[in-house]
Amino acid sequence: MSDVDVGVAVHSRDSSAAWHRWRYALPTVVGALIIVLAIHASTVESIVAIWWRSETFAHGFLIVPIVLALIWHRRRRLGVLTPHPDWLGVLLLVGAGAFWLAGYAGEVLVVRQLALVASIWGVVIAILGREVAQAMLFPLGFLVLAVPMGEVLIPPLMEWTADFTVVALQFSGIPVFREGLFFSIPSGEWSIVEGCSGVRYLIASFTVGVLFANLSYRRLWKRLLFVAASVIVPIIANGFRAYLIVMIAHLSDNRLAHGIDHFIYGWFFFGLVMLLLFWVGSFWRDAEDKSSPVGDGPVPDAPATPRVGFAAYAAAAIATVAAWPLYAQHLERQSIASAQTPLTLAAPAGARGWVLDSDPLTDWRPHYDPPSAGLFQTYRKGDKVVAVYLAYYRSQQRGAQLVSSWNVMIVQKHPVWNNVGQERVEGALGSGTLDVRETRLRSPQQRLLIWDWYRISGHDILSPYVAKLTLAADKLSNRGDAGSAIMLVAPYDDPTHPPTAVLREFATDMMPSIDGALARVDAALIASGQ
């Protein structure tokens, strides 16, 4: 018999053995995953919808095909393993389900999406076992990058880009006047908006960098080093990109870098930087591991799990996954029932010299989801004027939430208003008192100083993450999900002297009255049995 015949015979025998090991496990795990995706169809739909509408996350369409290709690339290694169901996967599904329910209760979409990925891991481990999951560790982990996340990085990246650009311009000898994310140079005015943050470049670079590192390097330190470079390089490059665009416009008397060429220069520069990064990274590529996944000798067959064993674990996994959405439906029915009673929020009574004023302080309004009840009321005390915005939410759902990424002081590229700065103020009313978020807005006619925070279950909360956790805990414990946004607004003229003292005085004088107005809404809900 020739060497070719021997090779064919060995390959045929290996394929037959692999099929014997996987003949029940493979269709079972595929079927279970399809059912899990069907159970979480709304979560799957939310992921795909974001891929479709956002260029930042459009690469998500490629993640699943890449994951399948990576698993296929490991088929020989997987073929010599014998799948064995594992209760660890079911335990992981319990944790993933609880995580999903918390995301549902808090209306945090990214938590539900991450929980779905964790559920996929749990199903794979429950049906195929830890050894098989270990062999698919990178493809399963890479699936996390299909989840559209990273927008939380936009504000700090915008701040970094503004800092870098201003310093670079000053280093170039150009005088700069900066106010928040806006800055002026002799040739014109500029602002750093979300599109300038570089988050799109960062996410794209990180995704490709992780894949490149796994395929190119065998040593862990090389992989980690390249992934770190794929994060650091685009952040620094984005600072240079913004600086170069401003310089091109400045040196061309604003003839260039203001229209579509603004984006062309940016993408060309980013593409060049990424090309250089991966070109340099290729010099340290490790040789591909040519060793056989089966070793030098024959691999003994481990006892195969019978069909009923795979079916039992698949049923347990599916039941565990389905339990959490069923409980969520129960909570949803309660929420719908409680939303039937209309709410009224009366203006807080004036106190300590502050009186209600019918003259509007400003035409500005926060860009918030429609509340269950709300008001915008102006108060005066001598020559001091402050407006109060209260928004009361209950039975919250998408499009009607207290805490949402859509809830902002102004939308990006607002035709009239600009956000020129935002910061945390600790102990706004004195040591040990509440913390507030301070925002400065400007328009051609007016400047506003705004303090805002959340009121949930009688507690003043500043962090949106803590607010989400509190709302989720209240909802899961059948205490409802009511909460309020509180904003105090004062006008001013001099950007160097914002009316901080006026807001502090107003809050000290009027908070008992504001608390009473919100407490009356809470009492009305309790009286109605909700």
Segments from the language model and where they lie:
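Hydrophobic N-terminal alpha-helices or hydrophobic patches in metabolic proteins across all domains
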Residues: 2-530
